[in-house]
């Protein structure tokens, strides 16, 4: 019989002494004199690994409306191309890199790269292009160098915004308890959007957009066995590259968005003590705006010396008192202190109060919030868990219509997991908002309608219910259903509540998701969701009027995929999506008759058919066809000169069919 013993084993055996008294536990082995480096496994080195895939796509788009670019990723007609990638690299020394890209080269795409050594450092680089299309506008105002020049010829402009975002970040781990990071981001936004001015009659025009935002974040993270602290700085600077706009016969008729900057210092941390976890944060910030102002008669200011200081603090705790009982709570405080300069305006038409016969100064507005949340969870029995909580929020506003509001909310949730195939979640909450006396704001006008209540400040009762269930009768089927209902009532509980304004609002709907794994080769899914929002409000324009506003939304979708064709090389599939939204407003004036105010209506059909064919283990072809049918109409939009004295950008409604055919080649690493 042959015995094969390596040198390390022989050394361990020789160090044990007499066989009769030996303890062969590895913890007693004496390896001090063993040259372990000479006996390392030469075949145990982990090789460098590349995983992922790279895809190049070439296609053709046929569309008569630029709005289709929101679905296809580009509004370019004709031939389009893009690159997708998801590649990772890892070697034995701990170096890791990752590259991700999606529709790179198209109007909506991104690329992201990460590289570094595990436990030491990481560098990240990101670029993203985001383009959104609204509609095509027609205008007779031409913009150049800050001047809006009227012209007899009509100019067609795409109302679209393009955002180019780039970021660079670096993380360095000094040791296992100390980590540092810094990141810089920049966004450039260009394009056109809808705007309005009076000159002397109302005119809608395509406002040019050319602005940039720079952001910088840096911080240090310290950690221990049961604690962690993050000390960081966050800053941003906004710059508008388009100044005030003028007409040939009137200067500075449209004020530009002012340049501004913001800075924050933050300290956040977490501490764990047995079954209790504490976490909190303190953030101090300052926002500054000191851009030039448009000069008008009676205005003594050349620029606005604006400054707002902010303070945010939060402390939260959660504790497992027993294996069945968990309790938690948080206290949140925020303050917005407006320290902008205060000036006295001597021009009567700007500052004169006809009731008090006095001149006034501009008033700075402050706001302060306190929020307290308490919650608990208790396991009633195996498979039954009850959660409940109380939320309190108080908001104080200076010089507002209502200086103080208080929200009190009680909520509860029952989670049932007793059964193998079905799970239930039942949630309910009830909230009441009250506060100080509601008075007309001195800043807005002391003659304001005393019966008018703004919905975000008025007394309100809110009740909300939600029921969710997950049903899995077999391993090839799963069904999720969620139903919700909420009602906001602005009733007259104290005789000082809403008479004019929003009276009541109901929000209810459902969401249904179905997943089917019919066989190893066949899968399917479907979903449906609907939402209804019904509101009642009243107003006063010569006569009291009442309005019912009904908004409804629906989303339907289904898909199927089958693999295993042509020797398991071919997979085919289809996806369908339908979306519809409808808004109706019915006005009843003095109960003398009802009038439709005008509706908004839109629907969208989207279909995708595709086939994927594996040329080999590392190469794959995909052919996909996508179709979109989109239609919308908005009664609030009118033609350019349909209303005397009003110039619009034309009808922006959509009604189009769009097609995209795309061939993709993928290489799998």
Where would I find each of the regions flagged by the language model?
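Gram-negative and organellar
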Residues: 22-46, 59-669
């Amino acid at each position: 019989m042959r015995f094969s013993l390596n040198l390390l084993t022989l050394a361990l055996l020789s160090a044990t002494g007499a066989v009769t008294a030996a303890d062969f536990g590895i913890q007693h082995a004496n390896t001090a004199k063993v040259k372990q480096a000479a006996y390392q496994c030469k075949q145990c080195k982990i090789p460098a690994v590349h995983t992922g895939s790279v895809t190049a796509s070439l296609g053709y788009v046929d569309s008569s409306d630029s709005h289709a670019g929101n679905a296809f990723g580009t509004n370019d007609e004709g031939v389009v191309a893009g690159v997708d990638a998801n590649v990772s690299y890892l070697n034995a020394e701990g170096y890791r890199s990752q590259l991700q890209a999606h529709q790179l080269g198209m109007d909506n795409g991104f690329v992201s790269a990460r590289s570094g050594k595990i436990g030491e450092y990481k560098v990240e680089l990101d670029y993203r292009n985001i383009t959104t299309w609204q509609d095509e506008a027609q205008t007779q105002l031409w913009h150049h160098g800050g001047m809006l020049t009227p012209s007899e010829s009509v100019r067609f402009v795409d109302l679209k915004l393009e955002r180019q975002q780039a970021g660079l970040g670096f993380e360095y781990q000094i040791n296992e308890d100390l980590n540092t990071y810094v990141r810089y981001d920049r966004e450039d936004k260009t394009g056109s959007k809808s705007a309005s001015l009076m000159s002397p009659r109302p005119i809608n025009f395509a406002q040019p957009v050319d602005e940039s935002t720079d952001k910088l974040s840096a911080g240090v993270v310290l950690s221990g066995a049961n604690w962690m602290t993050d000390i960081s700085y966050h800053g941003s600077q906004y710059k508008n590259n388009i100044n005030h706009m003028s007409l040939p016969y009137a200067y500075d008729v449209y004020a530009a968005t002012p340049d501004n900057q913001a800075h924050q210092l933050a300290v956040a941390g977490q501490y764990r003590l047995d079954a209790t976890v504490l976490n909190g944060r303190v953030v101090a910030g300052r926002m500054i705006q000191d851009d030039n102002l448009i000069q008008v008669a009676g205005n003594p200011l050349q620029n606005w010396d604006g400054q707002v200081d902010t303070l945010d603090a939060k402390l939260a705790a959660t504790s497992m008192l027993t294996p069945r009982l968990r309790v938690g709570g948080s206290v949140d405080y925020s303050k917005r202190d407006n320290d902008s300069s205060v000036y006295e305006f001597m021009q009567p038409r700007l500052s004169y109060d006809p009731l008090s016969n006095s001149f006034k100064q501009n008033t700075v507005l402050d706001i302060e919030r306190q929020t307290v949340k308490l919650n608990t969870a208790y396991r009633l029995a195996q498979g039954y868990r009850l959660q409940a909580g109380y939320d309190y929020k108080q908001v104080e506003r200076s010089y507002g219509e209502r200086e103080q509001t208080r929200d009190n909310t009680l909520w509860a949730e029952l989670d049932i997991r007793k059964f193998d195939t079905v799970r239930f979640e039942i949630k309910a909450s009830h909230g009441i908002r009250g506060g100080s006396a509601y008075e007309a704001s001195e800043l807005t006008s002391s003659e304001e309608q005393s019966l008018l209540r703004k919905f975000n400040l008025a007394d309100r009762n809110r009740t909300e219910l939600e029921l969710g269930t997950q049903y899995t009768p077999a391993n090839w089927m799963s069904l999720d259903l969620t139903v919700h209902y909420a009602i906001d009532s602005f009733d007259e509980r104290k005789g000082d509540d809403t008479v004019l304004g929003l009276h009541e609002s109901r929000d209810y709907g459902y969401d249904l998701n179905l997943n089917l794994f019919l066989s190893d080769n066949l899968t399917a899914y479907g979903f449906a969701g609907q939402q209804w929002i019904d509101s009642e409000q009243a107003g006063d324009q010569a006569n009291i009027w009442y309005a019912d506003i009904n908004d409804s939304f629906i989303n339907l979708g289904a898909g199927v995929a089958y693999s295993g064709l042509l020797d398991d090389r071919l997979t085919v599939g289809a996806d369908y999506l339908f979306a519809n939204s409808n808004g109706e407003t019915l006005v009843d004036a003095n109960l003398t008759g009802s009038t439709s105010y005008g509706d908004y209506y839109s629907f969208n059909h989207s279909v995708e058919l595709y086939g994927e064919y594996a040329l080999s283990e590392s190469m794959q072809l995909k052919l996909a066809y996508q179709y979109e049918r989109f239609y919308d109409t908005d009664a609030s939009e009118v033609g350019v000169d349909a209303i005397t004295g009003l110039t619009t950008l034309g009808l922006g409604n959509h009604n189009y069919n769009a097609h995209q055919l795309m061939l993709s080649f993928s290489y799998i690493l």
